[in-house]
């Protein structure tokens, strides 16, 4: 197991916190994906690296037929509980994105929400090409903080850079740009798919002070720090927010491509 995959699997240890604090995705994102990829009504979707189902639940709520694939048992347990609570039909499979075990040409769409960077990209795209029908597509999307448009987010990143060391500084300074380029490169190299499209959909999310700090502590690069450093980060973050101030700071960024 590679270090990247191991870091991704570290989320299993805090599945409940992940589900409580991680941001959701707007309905407009899925409308945009459906339009760009010319999906049929109620498409059959495989959601890879589904986690606790932030995207799976959103798509199922829209009436999409969702199969959630997730290697982590604790994450799947939360997803299944949410599906039962919300009376949603979501099929679940405990497997990796690189080897789902699903039938060939079974889906109109494959998605990966805030997850593709954890995958073995060539292997995952080969598996996606296998399970997606001709004329179907893949959509890879992230909620991304807008540092350029938010002084609050810029301050938050400076805290992480100060306490997180070289690895976190590298992630914050270059990770998003590198992730975008490697995603597009991986899609371009996957001969089963047509040209990739990079789309941006701006949306705003709010959080209380506790919610913001809770979200920050679901990041793998924060969880990897020692407890004393985590406590210092939490104190500074609470100081930034000053009470229950609402924070608006994210947008969704999908990459999509169609299978001829």
PLM regions: where:
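Nucleotide donor/acceptor-binding cores
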Residues: 42-43, 105
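Conserved catalytic/acceptor-binding region of the Class I
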Residues: 130-203
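Conserved Class I S-adenosyl-L-methionine
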Residues: 52, 178-260
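Short catalytic micro-motifs in class I SAM-dependent methyltransferases
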Residues: 114
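Conserved class I S-adenosyl-L-methionine
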Residues: 1-41
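A short acidic, Gly/Pro-enriched loop at the edge of an enzyme's catalytic core
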Residues: 99-109
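A short, conserved alpha-helix within the catalytic core of class I
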Residues: 119-127
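Class I SAM-dependent methyltransferase SAM/SAH-binding core
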Residues: 44-46, 52-99
């Amino acid at each position: 197991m590679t270090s990247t995959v191991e870091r991704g699997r570290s989320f299993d240890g805090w599945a409940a916190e992940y589900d409580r604090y991680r941001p959701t995705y707007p309905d407009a994102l899925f409308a945009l994906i459906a339009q760009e990829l010319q999906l049929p009504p109620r498409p059959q979707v495989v959601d890879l690296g589904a986690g606790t189902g932030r995207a799976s639940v959103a798509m199922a709520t829209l009436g999409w037929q969702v199969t959630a694939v997730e290697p982590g048992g604790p994450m799947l347990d939360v997803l299944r509980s949410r599906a039962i609570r919300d009376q949603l039909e979501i099929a679940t499979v405990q497997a990796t994105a690189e080897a789902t075990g699903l039938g060939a040409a079974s889906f109109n769409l494959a998605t990966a929400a805030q997850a593709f960077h954890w995958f073995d990209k060539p292997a995952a795209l080969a598996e996606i090409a296998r399970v997606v029908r001709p004329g179907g597509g893949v959509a890879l999307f992230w909620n991304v903080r807008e540092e350029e448009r938010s002084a609050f987010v810029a301050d938050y990143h400076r805290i992480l850079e100060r306490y997180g060391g070289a690895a976190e500084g590298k992630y914050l300074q270059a990770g998003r740009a590198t992730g975008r380029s490697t995603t597009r490169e991986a899609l371009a190299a996957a001969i089963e798919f047509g040209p990739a499209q990079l789309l941006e959909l701006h949306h705003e999310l709010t959080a209380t002070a506790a919610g913001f700090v809770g979200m920050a502590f679901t990041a793998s690069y924060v969880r990897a720090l020692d407890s004393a450093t985590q406590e210092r980060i939490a104190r500074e973050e609470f100081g930034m927010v000053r009470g229950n101030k609402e924070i608006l700071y994210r947008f969704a960024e999908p990459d999509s491509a169609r299978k001829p």
